[in-house]
Amino acid sequence: MSTAAVLVYPDFFKVAVSSAGNHDNAIYNRWWSEKHSGVKEIISEKGDTSFLYNIDKNPDLVKNLKGKLLLFHGEIDNNVHPANTMRVANALIKANKRFDMKILPTQRHGFGDMAEYVFWGMSDYFAKYLIGDNTERPVDLEEMNKEIEQSGNKKKQ
């Protein structure tokens, strides 16, 4: 949704970070699209029923990008296929649009033990492009994972 927002309303949204984004409903679960984006039932004069999905695809909207965009995706995402992000990246490149992208090796949809890395990556990106803070904050994933284990919270893998 963040990518769609920066592409549909480019004069309002200046920065977006997409985390395992569903950029093209044609290659995602139809039930999700129907539930969250709506579907229009059309009954012909003969009584035949068809359904209209009028959901814009982010790759078709990339020409509108004016702001900054960071795309994250897990290499083995088992919910939203990485092809969703690859399609929007391909369209952005063909439209000669600048963007940032990070593919997280061995990670699924929730980013597993790299979730903190993604969180701080998003934080740094927003700080840099919204308030001009270019301070890089190193993320010690091993230390963060130790702290999580010591606190008794279990991480999803």
What are these language model-derived features?
Residues 1-157:
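Active-site-proximal cap/loop segments of hydrolase catalytic domains
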